Structure formats: C-alpha cells, structure tokens
Amino acid sequence: MTLQNAPLPSLSWSLVTLFGLQTVLGLVQWRLHPSRQAASTDKGVKKSSSSGDSSSSVFSVLNTSIAIGAVGTLICHIFAVLFGAGIFNQAKETSQLAVYLSLLTFYPASFILGTDLKSWLRIFVHNSPGTYTEAAFYCQGMMTIFGAWLGSIVIPLDWDRPWQAWPVPCVLGAFMFYCIGTVVGLVVSIVMRQRAARSEFGIGPGTGTAQAGSKKNKSE
C-alpha cells in the first residue's frame, strides 16, 4: 500500500505519524521558549508543586494546539475549495489534504503563539514576524502553502501517472517545500540573531564613523 496506489489509507497513516512528530517538536519548543521560562520564574513556583503544574499546563497547551489545528484544518479546506477542489466530489481526499496542511502550518505554530490572534494576523497576514521563532514559522507556513499550490499544477496534465491522483501531488509538494521552508527559516533566524547581536554591541554599518566623530568632538 503506497501513497500512489491507495491515497486515502496511506495519507491516514502518514497523518498519524506527522501528528505525533509535530506534537513532540511543539512541546519541546514550548518548554524551551523564553516566554514560558520567564513566566515560570515570575510566578515563583515551588519545586514541590512544579511537576503537577507543568503536567496540567502541558495538557492545556496540547488542548489549545489541537483546537487551533482543527480551526486551521477548516481554513485550509475552505481555501482548497476556493482554489478549485470539489465541495462534495472527493471530499475525503480534500479533508485529508487540509489536515496535512494544518499539521505543517497552524499546529506547530500554535504551541508558541497560542490564542494570540494579533500575533497570528501580524505574522501570517501582515507578513511581519518579529522574533526568530516567528520568522521560522512564517517561512515554514508560506513555503508549505506554496508547495501545495505548485503540486496542483501537475494534476490536470495527461500523463496518466498514479501519483497524479488528488491530492497526492499537493501533499508531496507541501512536504517538500515545508522542508525547504524549515531550512530557510533557520537561515533567517541565524541572520536575525547576528544582526541583533551586532546592534547590541554597537557593531554595524556607520557605527565606526559615528564613534570616531564622537571621539573627535570630545577631544575638541
């Protein structure tokens, strides 16, 4: 049973695997995120009660992320229909594509962004991520959607190949460009960190000239 010959069962198994991997990665990112660490230190939680609080908070974050992922699935399904997918024809395949796209875009970002609607709109609608993590999520999400759209180009071609069945090309394109977006997001995050470090230590274009001018004024 392969993705080409049996799209529905194969996509179902791949979705279960992808959900597990994205959940583990999302929880790890959530625990290591600076905002969570700052919040835990500000509250001054004792070590004796930290385990119970952390377990309850993990379930809370997981429930929130699953809910956001479900909303993301609905949004992806609507956009798939708007871009030409049938409303009733092959609805199961379209739904699985929507779940796949949501697991690659909405679900991982929900562990950090949560229910902060302003952050979601600022990053994905206004195209202005402000932190390294937000830049990585933005690159992953945009590249995933672009890959799914690019994969749909080969569906109407008369090649008569099994992998042209809906929604196999879109899934393959989304996953391939998600991997590319992960690399691009990593590079963008590194560049943003380097620029932030340079500005913090006063290293940047024109800095040396400004410092030399200030020293000259002081000597005069």
Name each model feature, range by range.
Residues 135-139, 157, 161-204:
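Structured partner-binding subdomains within large eukaryotic complex subunits
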Residues 40-52, 197-220:
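Non-transmembrane, juxtamembrane loop and terminal tail segments
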Residues 5-22, 56-70, 88-106, 132-143, ...:
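Transmembrane alpha-helices of multi-pass eukaryotic membrane proteins
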Residues 30-53, 118-121:
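Membrane-helix interface/capping segments
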